[in-house]
Amino acid sequence: MFNNYGNVMMTDQFRKVEQYSPKSSPRAGGAGGRSPVVARQDSSGTLKTTIQLGKNPSIVHSGPFYLMKEPPGEGELTGATNLMAHYGLEHSYSKFSGKKVKEQLSSFLPNLPGVIDGPGHLDNSSLRSVIEKPPIGGKDLLPLTSVQLAGFRLHPGPLPEQYKHLKSVPTRKHKNKHKKHKYKEGVAPLSEQSALEASGLDTHEKKHKKQKRHEDDKERKKRKKEKKRKKQRHSPEHPGSGAASMPPQTQVF
């Protein structure tokens, strides 16, 4: 009886294992028990798309015809279109290009060599003429020697006389002559120190006179107030006159 019960249990376990075996799995097949992933045929005829979410969502074509797109429409502006005529700028172009310039170009660029006021095709100095007809040189281009390169280096010392006028800046006339200039170290230059020493006594006397005049004005105002106070005290209309009158109140100015 026990043997029959054991056989029944063994057959049940074998059936359960057989249900989950790779042979019965729909993915089984081929080497290693794994079948290759086969894309499903799309019978609707539409393109397959995949939507990618995230920071930059986008739609990716994943079907077999993802590279086939609609051709772009014909544009109005092409490389053969005359943009001046298309935007109606021919009149403005002729107006500004035919205007005579008051000052020549050489007045703005005096150090530029060659004749730059006229058009370049007259003396074959335009860029097109140089490209079409390059200059014929008898020698090859050689690197500069150390002596020649010394002319491009900065040397210590003062600037030569012929170049000083290029860097000279016209001096400005100060409108406020009495304005006091502040210096970084608090010391005036030598040219102004001599002038200050010469006029030191005069400025001291002027300052003393101004201070004395201010004190005299202050003393005069004080005497005038005292005189006015005494006059009000002895007047009959003043309420403080008499023996039983109240003491005069001092006024604070």
Swiss-Prot record:
Is Protein biosynthesis among the key words of this record? no
Enumerate the UniProt keywords alphabetically: Activator, Nucleus, Transcription, Transcription regulation
Superkingdom of origin organism: Eukaryota
> What Pfam families does this protein map onto?
Med19
**UniProt region (Disordered), positions on chain:** 18-49, 157-253
**Cell compartments where the protein resides:** Nucleus
- Record's GO cellular component, any one? mediator complex
Q: Which InterPro entries match?
A: Mediator_Med19_met
Q: Which spans are transmembrane here?
A: none
Keyword Aminoacyl-tRNA synthetase, does the record have it? no
> Which GO BP annotation is one of this protein's?
positive regulation of transcription by RNA polymerase II
A molecular function GO annotation: transcription coregulator activity
Could you tell me what this protein does? Component of the Mediator complex, a coactivator involved in the regulated transcription of nearly all RNA polymerase II-dependent genes. Mediator functions as a bridge to convey information from gene-specific regulatory proteins to the basal RNA polymerase II transcription machinery. Mediator is recruited to promoters by direct interactions with regulatory proteins and serves as a scaffold for the assembly of a functional preinitiation complex with RNA polymerase II and the general transcription factors.
**Identification of the protein by name:** Mediator of RNA polymerase II transcription subunit 19
Its lineage reads:
Eukaryota, Metazoa, Ecdysozoa, Arthropoda, Hexapoda
